[in-house]
């Protein structure tokens, strides 16, 4: 733990690829991006298509060359109607782009640029830039993207109309965009390695539209990849995602990933989720990349049922995945089905009956580590964020560290990756 807790921030800039004219804007560059991103192997396809019928379309049309835009403005978007939660995700497009095009790529759970920690990136051929927009209030509600630019990278001067590969990469809390000329192989890239959601979390389906330009761009193919057969995936809602954590390196799943560098670890979580949302992840995610172990923390948004847990266990069994169901943190709620006492009593009863283990996040975050799930179990308020209300709901950095410390105590086989 000491190695993690002593991580320092700095303002170094790094050029991780020798053939790239991109720039890394970073305050955590002590973490090797080359090792974590560019040498990543063992991916699996979540989606691959060249056909208009696989997208939600407004005015784009199918041509011999591919899927072509027919107008400008966000009303003329094309949408990949798939909602991926996995935090290692590689979206790759082959495009034909006009010399005057400004293309927008927005991940949104509601309207374009709005929702749960959305993101918005762009290719601006006329001004020879690729860039990322800022997310408003990344340590608070983080519900929409601003018009302010977070960062830009210059294209090589000889980039003109033609075919390009555009990659959008999410790796943990990092966002990377890279534009590569199909013929010359020259590229430019931009990396956000901030430890808060400065440019969003790429949450929600991908929307693409032409903001400016007379030459209509063409999508020749679109692919989405993720890590195949990870050793562990941490699954849940905003608490697992790291909502309101002032340094995302201290999320429980992130601490585990840093402490286990030789293992494949993912986080698949989204603010506002319930058990129903987790069950829906199997069709588009878990059944495809088949994690070996799944650590679930769910219930703060209500919706837990023993039947839902039965379905979760069955779906995990079907793909050969070991399930761990953790107790909820000791948060405050006025809604009966969301109170940690109600949620944790249900989890305990079901887990004992089904021989399922889970970490005691309730003990970790309770005042005086009181292990009784009743009204006397009050939260340790020093372990919760004050950026949103209710205050005692989202663990802060200190709270996530205390939660992480429960893993070797309650789940030693999982934490030490013991083969049983």
Descriptions of predicted regions:
Residues 211-271, 276, 281-290:
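Serine-esterase "nucleophile elbow" of acetyl-processing enzymes
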């Amino acid at each position: 733990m000491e190695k993690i807790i002593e991580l320092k921030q700095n303002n170094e800039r790094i050029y991780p690829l020798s053939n790239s004219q991109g720039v890394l804007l970073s305050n955590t560059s002590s973490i090797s991006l080359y090792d974590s991103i560019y040498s990543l192997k063992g991916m699996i396809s979540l989606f691959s298509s060249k056909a208009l019928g696989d997208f939600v379309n407004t005015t784009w049309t199918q041509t011999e060359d591919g899927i072509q835009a027919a107008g400008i403005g966000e009303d003329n978007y094309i949408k990949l109607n798939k909602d991926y939660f996995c935090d290692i995700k590689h979206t790759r497009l082959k495009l034909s782009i006009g010399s005057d095009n400004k293309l927008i790529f927005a991940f949104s759970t509601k309207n374009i640029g709005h929702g749960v920690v959305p993101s918005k990136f762009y290719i601006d051929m006329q001004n020879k830039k690729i860039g990322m927009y800022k997310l408003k209030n990344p340590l608070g509600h983080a519900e929409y993207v601003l018009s302010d630019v977070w960062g830009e990278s210059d294209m090589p001067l000889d980039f003109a109309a033609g075919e390009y590969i555009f990659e959008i990469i999410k790796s943990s809390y990092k966002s990377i965009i890279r534009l590569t000329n199909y013929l010359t192989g020259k590229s430019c890239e931009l990396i956000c390695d901030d430890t808060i959601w400065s440019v969003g979390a790429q949450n929600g389906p991908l929307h693409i539209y032409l903001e400016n330009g007379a030459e209509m761009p063409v999508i020749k193919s679109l692919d989405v990849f993720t890590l195949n057969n990870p050793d562990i995936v941490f699954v849940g809602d905003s608490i697992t995602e790291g909502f309101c954590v002032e340094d995302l390196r201290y999320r429980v799943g992130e601490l585990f990933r840093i402490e286990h560098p030789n293992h494949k670890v993912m986080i698949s979580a989204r603010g506002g989720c319930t058990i129903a949302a987790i069950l829906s992840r199997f069709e588009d995610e878990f059944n495809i990349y088949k994690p070996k172990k799944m650590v679930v923390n769910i219930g703060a948004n209500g919706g837990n049922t023993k039947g839902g847990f039965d379905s979760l266990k069955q779906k995990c069994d079907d793909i050969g995945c070991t399930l761990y169901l953790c107790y909820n943190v000791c948060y405050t709620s006025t809604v009966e089905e969301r109170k940690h006492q109600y949620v944790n009593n249900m989890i305990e009863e079901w887990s004992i009956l089904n021989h399922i283990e889970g970490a005691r996040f309730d003990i970790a975050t309770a005042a005086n580590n009181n292990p009784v799930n009743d009204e006397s179990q009050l939260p340790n308020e020093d372990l919760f964020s004050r950026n949103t209300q209710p205050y005692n709901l989202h663990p802060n950095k200190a709270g996530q560290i205390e939660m992480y410390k429960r893993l070797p105590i309650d789940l030693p086989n999982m934490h030490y990756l013991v083969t049983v």
